A protein has these predicted regions:
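TM-adjacent membrane-interface loops and short helices in multi-pass inner/ER membrane proteins
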Residues: 235-283, 294-298
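A juxtamembrane structural motif centered on a specific transmembrane helix
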Residues: 343-388
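Short capping/connector residues at structural and topological boundaries
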Residues: 17, 87-89, 94, 267-268, ...
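Pore-lining and gate-forming transmembrane alpha-helices of multi-pass membrane transport proteins
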Residues: 288, 299, 330-331, 359, ...
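Hydrophobic alpha-helical transmembrane segments
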Residues: 112-113, 250-258, 369-378
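Hydrophobic alpha-helical transmembrane segments of multi-pass inner membrane proteins, especially
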Residues: 2-14, 18-245, 291-348, 373-377
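Transmembrane helix boundary and interhelical junction motifs in multipass membrane proteins
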Residues: 139-144, 265-270, 281-283, 348, ...
């Protein structure tokens, strides 16, 4: 983690020094120090204590998400942060941790999920409430992270992979709903798989009903997105058509990464960065700064270290002494994995621009403090893996 944090500070300095001097990198260094303190503090909290307070933490996070919609601030009319003067507090970062803790507590109290419709619906409610509030800010990227965290946690809880596939089928329903032939094929395939798998009639009805409802509402869902969100999705599908609009940042980020070559142009020498062609260089597109100025080798090294950290987090989950600890480790590891894949993907034009930051590297006080705090919880889990 120290290597990633150091890389992040260097990239933040390089991407902001010409416009703002050392103010950004100084603030990030302070937030990292606070995050380290949070990590040490969290590592001393027993997981049993976290399990007991998980409902309260979740309730506080949901309450803050509701309040920020009324009293929050943010760019372009969004309401994502509380302005505290010396920093901006982003409740959605706490919501990610709170959702993992509360969902882990719920799953650990169930012997098995199996085909229990009630259990699956409860999981949907646990992740759906904070995800909906975050989406309303609007912050589609973080909302998707909160929602998708449930998938690996349910897998760890023993839910059949086939059932997990059906949990994400509504997303396919939204896509298929745009064309009648695709919708017919999707519906027929969905029903055929459920019949061949010998699902209970009630479960077949539930899955079909949810997909039919979501598919029917697809036009409303699309129009319910903010204009810039629709443009980002359209730009992802056809970036050249939006080269002077929503697709501009993706195209410029790809150019920056590709122009770095093997060893990069050198620190502070990035032309795409210096000309301001890549927006949000110190947050969403910090990977493009690393690619342009430090090259492929440094980019590959960053990804390798991130992969190592993620694998170690999953390894801690396997060594955990109880189910609750296993689930929280799976949840936090998945959180880092999802954000890494999406952020790097949007820097390479492989995923839509969602505003998700790159874990450990991007600028952001709330994100780095909460992230390091979650790592402290995993350290607590690791220290008690043998029951002491």
């Amino acid at each position: 983690m120290a290597i990633l944090l150091a890389f992040g500070l260097v990239a933040i300095y390089s991407s902001t020094v010409h416009q703002s001097g050392t103010s950004y990198v100084t603030r990030q260094a302070v937030w990292i120090a606070v995050g380290m303190a949070a990590m040490v503090g969290a590592s001393r909290i027993r997981t049993k204590t976290l399990e007991a307070f998980a409902p309260l933490i979740y309730a506080v996070a949901v309450l803050l998400l509701a309040i920020v919609l009324v009293a929050g601030t943010g760019p372009h009319g969004a309401k994502r942060w509380f302005n505290l003067g010396f920093m901006s507090l982003q409740p959605s970062e706490l919501a990610k941790i709170a959702t993992v803790l509360f969902l882990a507590r719920y799953l650990s109290g169930r012997k098995e999920i199996g085909e229990s419709i009630r259990s699956v619906l409860t999981v949907f409610a646990i992740v759906g409430l904070p995800a909906f509030l975050v989406l309303y800010e609007p912050d589609m990227g973080t909302a998707l992270v909160i929602a998708f965290i449930a998938i690996p946690m349910l897998y760890a809880a023993g839910l059949d992979p086939l059932y997990l596939a059906f949990l994400v089928s509504p997303l396919l329903a939204v896509i298929a709903a745009g064309e009648i032939v695709a919708w017919i094929i999707f519906t027929a395939f969905l029903i055929a798989v459920m019949v061949l798998a010998k699902f209970r009639t009630s479960l077949v009805a539930l899955i079909f009903g949810v997909n039919f409802l979501v598919g029917s509402l697809a036009p409303r869902i699309w129009m319910g997105l903010e204009p810039y969100q629709r443009e980002r999705i359209q730009a992802f599908l056809n970036p050249e058509a939006y080269s002077h609009g929503a697709g501009f940042q993706t195209i410029q980020a790809k150019i920056a990464v590709g122009s770095g070559g093997l060893i990069g142009k050198g620190l502070l020498q990035g032309t795409q960065k210096a000309l301001g062609l890549v927006p949000e260089q110190h947050t969403d597109f910090i990977f493009s700064v690393i690619g342009e100025e430090m090259g492929f080798l440094a980019s590959a090294a960053v990804l390798a270290v991130l992969a190592y950290v993620i694998l170690k987090l999953f390894d801690v989950a396997k060594q955990a002494r109880d189910r609750f600890t296993t689930y929280i480790c799976f949840g936090f590891a998945s959180m880092v994995l999802i954000q890494t894949v999406v952020n790097v993907g949007m820097n390479l034009g492989m995923t839509p621009v969602t505003g998700l930051t790159l874990p450990f590297l991007s600028y952001g006080g709330s994100s780095v403090i909460m992230l390091l705090g979650s790592m402290g919880i995993i350290l607590s889990a690791y220290s008690t893996r043998k029951g002491y």
